[in-house]
Amino acid sequence: MAGFRSLAREVRDPHHDLALRRYSLRKCLERFAPYGHRATWDHLCARHHIGPEDRAPDPARLVAALDELEEARTVWLAYEAEFAERRKREKHAGLRRPGPFDDWHRRTWGGCGVVWCADPAVHPSWPLAEVLRRLISALRSDPAACCPVCAERSIGWSTGAAPEEWSGPVCTRCGILVPQPVLTPAALTGARKGRHTALASVA
């Protein structure tokens, strides 16, 4: 099975036909898709003006979409390496009991669905790397009462619309599933009590 970097080379290879290069970009999303496969594809198509069903898109736009995806992947893998090293030090010091962050990282390791969007048409529109930097900043900070990406304070609760492991607090503005460890207990309680309302795209 081809890895991300091998698929990225296929996307950039001008000797391949455009349908194959597009297919390889879609396959990259099976290795790294911060919003989930469908939502990340929708995001890249919107930002780089690629028709979602266009089998022969402008190659420059394909490469630009890949560049954005690669930058985000670099940001996230650097954070994961830092997190893994910290856990190694903690275990060496005898701190072996997993915390809430450990469970969340286990489910998102590798970056697939790290900012999961249950509705593929509703997601942040900033560059992926910027979204991940905002999330990482929140993961390193004290819990807050707002979305770590767009700072929206209206947090709903998603159940049933996504796979069970993705149920939880959802930003009603940008559509991401908010990692529970970055929210205060009061914000989590409010999200559970509130309704998950229709989402609007965020610019």
What are the language-model segments listed below?
Residues 38-64:
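Short, charged early-sequence alpha-helical segments and their helix-coil boundaries
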Residues 175-191:
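Short metal-binding segments enriched for Cys and/or His
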Residues 12-20, 35-37, 52-56, 116-123:
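Charged, low-complexity interaction regions
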Residues 147-150, 171-174:
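Short cysteine-rich clusters marking metal-coordination/redox-active sites
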Residues 140-144, 168:
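Residues immediately within or flanking Cys/His clusters that coordinate Zn2+
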Residues 152-156, 179:
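Short functional micro-motifs and their immediate structural scaffolds
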Residues 158-169:
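Short linker/helix segments within small regulatory modules
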